[in-house]
């Protein structure tokens, strides 16, 4: 294996030098998303320096994808993280970032323990785009920035308005974001004492209870059960979910 690599890697390096920066970025993304992503480190060690040397050839979006792919592969690349952080401070480069990319950036820098590098730039950007956030972006943001309560509440309040039109998948993501961001307050055992957002989510579950798939119901139960703050809401879920609820809670208990 080692002797073969000694022959192959210089040729690979030579081949990679002929590709465009965007194509190299796409290769890295493919490696990160491959199911057997115990990606060959030798190939990555050849590909990543090439990507770094072509940094200025690609857009900020591709550079974000590069650090995202490396983070997926559990690789922290300080120089690339710094260069992306520097570019994010550049108003013209950062102006076209979508909420999806903003959430992706937050995920990358939190996972790499480097949120301080970008927080001053990203928080105002996210705030000014709050109205454009969809449920999936909101859920990802709430998972990585649960401490940014004011910001998350701003997005949740805007999404709350569209709750009646949400499909189940979007509702699950919205609910996940509300649970992670601890936005469902107050939570009382009786209906009258609950906050409007809490009651609206429970009401959605009641109205759509027959349309939820079993695995979706299980996700809601898992989510609430594992949240110290909202564990009590499991009892407020629709009665028709009781059998699934009991099975799921038994399974959680058995797993210990």
Task: Describe the predicted segments one by one.
Residues 1-256:
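Eukaryotic RNA-binding helical-repeat scaffolds
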